[in-house]
Swiss-Prot record:
Name of the protein described by the UniProt record: GH3 domain-containing protein
Species of the source: Homo sapiens (Human)
Record lineage: Eukaryota, Metazoa, Chordata, Craniata, Vertebrata
A molecular-function term among this protein's GO annotations: acid-amino acid ligase activity
Region (Disordered): 99-122
Annotated transmembrane regions: none
Sites of N5-methylglutamine modification: 489
Encoding gene per record: GHDC
GO cellular component: cytoplasm; endoplasmic reticulum; extracellular region; membrane; nuclear envelope; secretory granule lumen; specific granule lumen
């Protein structure tokens, strides 16, 4: 019953926003903006408090919460499982529904691996919970961020798992509501020197924004000076030019001296961009992600922004999640799954999601390591995605192992900073004709314009140090050395545009690092500069 007052407030807020927009030129109605902000924030705080209480109860009674989630799945199934509908016994459920994999063979020519068929409607409550709790956590850590005119989003996508129709403009977010022009979003942000928070859908999208700002900075400064759009701001345009002339390091704080935090949605393949942004453009700023978006719409919640980046709570409510233990060096098909309360600290597990519509238990491929607990629920760090494994001779180089080896190799390239990378097995590009199969590795760097042969060889050496199996195959000549290519600026932006155009692509938010389709690999191959 308490939900109805909140819904009434939400219905009133768009009307207030419209009235504010229509009468924004009338100084006599400036009080309306303050009223609108107070009403919006009061509704948000109330809703977040309600969601937090629900989360506390569910994490204190994990087994009961997961039983309810399982019952929710069984009742919503679109195919008959009569024996299951009458029982939520976990053993019966597991015996009737064997584990399946998100197939790597059912790929469309125009995209990456399709995700499990989880309904957005089914996951709506989980995404709403992540958004409300994330906003509350952000406000607690940075109280001034959600004040009027202190936040700007610079990408079309939002970092909030379920962007609400009212908080952005109502809570004073900079920019025109509903704009579909990324350039307009960036211009609105650049015109506002008092920002406290910068939002972007994901870290890789924000990386593209800053790279584009370096390229198009003079054009953007000219638009600000000319008042296109808005009033002419010649002094602000001069500040933009001066900030860009000093290079990328610390650029965000030069543009917005009061900036405190960067808000992006965490997902697979984003850590590299976060590191690059933190070392260069966003140096000195905190990063906050309200959630981790795993495969199939599963969300890990970030309830404590002050903790180390990358720790997330796996909530026990719908959708129904199980954990499949990962054995070192193998993935046992016959291993039994565990419930959330049975997870052990220090162990690694693959997430298993039950799709409500098809009643399918699907192995998502997302591997987590349990690092702590919140009440009775595991707090995890997402380690890797099994579908991002490289294997040309059965060597199985995992995403985490490859990223670590690449990081060590780049660390030996004097002056180089890794911005982006993508991998392709040689068979995709038919580049192993007359030679052993190998990896084609494409990198985007800052601080290094050419790769020497010595630089290229270091990645292969690091891979051999990291994987005895790979080293053995290299020794016998069964696998050729990894070939490293430097791509020009804009290569990965073009790749992301191609990915975003694919309906079955996981991007955004997840960024694939192993490309399985020729046309995607060619986005990088065609832009090699060294």
């Amino acid at each position: 019953m308490l939900l109805w007052p909140l819904l009434l407030l939400l219905l009133l807020l768009p009307t207030l926003a419209l009235l504010r927009q229509q009468r924004s030129q009338d100084a006599r109605l400036s009080w309306l903006a303050g009223l609108q902000h107070r009403v919006a924030w009061g509704a948000l705080v109330w809703a977040a408090t309600w969601q937090r209480r629900r989360l506390e109860q569910s994490t204190l009674h994990v087994h009961q919460s997961q039983q309810q989630a399982l019952r929710w799945c069984l009742q919503g199934a679109q195919r008959p499982h009569c024996s299951l509908r009458r029982s939520t016994d976990i053993s019966t459920f597991r015996n009737h529904l064997p584990l399946t994999k998100a197939s790597q063979t059912q790929q469309e020519d125009s995209g990456e691996q399709p995700l499990p068929p989880t309904s957005n409607q089914d996951l709506g409550e989980a995404s709403l919970q992540a958004t409300l709790l994330g906003l509350a956590a952000l406000n607690k850590a940075y109280p001034e961020v959600l004040a009027q005119g202190r936040t700007a989003r610079v990408t079309l996508t939002s970092p909030w798992p379920r962007p609400l129709p009212w908080p952005g403009n109502t809570l004073g977010q900079v920019g025109t509501p509903g704009t579909k022009d990324p350039r307009a979003l960036l211009l609105d942000a650049l015109r506002s020197p008092g920002l406290r928070a910068l939002e972007a859908g994901t870290a890789v999208e924000l990386l593209d924004v800053f790279l584009g700002l370096e390229t198009d900075g003079e054009e953007l400064a000219g638009a600000i000076a000319a008042g296109n759009p808005g009033a002419p701001l010649r002094e602000r345009a001069a500040e933009l030019r001066e900030a860009l002339e000093q290079g990328p390091r610390g650029l965000a704080l030069r543009l917005w001296p009061k900036l405190q935090v960067v808000v992006t949605l965490d997902a697979g393949g984003q850590a590299e961009a976060v590191a690059a942004l933190g070392a260069l453009w966003c140096q000195g700023l905190a990063f906050f992600s309200p959630a981790y978006a795993a495969s199939g719409g599963v969300l890990g919640l970030n309830l404590q922004p002050e903790q180390p980046h990358g720790l997330y709570l796996l909530p026990p409510g719908a959708p129904f999640i199980e954990l499949l233990p990962v054995k070192e060096g193998t993935q046992e098909e016959a291993a039994s799954t565990l419930l959330l309360a049975e997870a052990q600290q220090g162990k690694e597990y693959e997430l298993v999601l039950t799709d409500r519509a098809s009643l399918t238990r699907c192995r998502l491929g997302d591997v987590v390591r349990v690092v702590g607990a919140y009440n009775q629920c595991p707090v995890v760090r997402f380690i890797c995605r099994l579908d991002q494994t490289l294997s040309v001779r059965g060597e199985d180089i995992g995403e985490d192992l490859f990223s670590e080896a690449l990081g060590r190799a780049v660390g030996q390239w004097a002056g180089a900073k890794l911005l982006d990378h993508g991998c392709v097995e040689s068979s995709i590009l038919d580049s192993s004709a007359g030679s052993a199969p190998h990896y084609e590795v494409f990198v985007a760097l800052r601080g290094l314009r050419n790769l020497s042969e010595e630089n290229r060889d270091k990645l292969d050496h690091c891979l051999q140090e990291a994987s005895p199996r790979y080293k053995s195959l290299r020794f016998w000549g069964s696998v050729g050395p990894a070939r490293v290519h430097l791509v020009g600026q804009g290569a990965f932006r073009a790749l992301r545009a191609a990915l975003a155009a694919c309906p079955s692509s996981p991007f955004p938010p997840a960024m694939p690092r192993v490309l399985r389709h020729r046309h995607l690999a060619q986005c990088l191959q065609e832009r090699v500069v060294s």
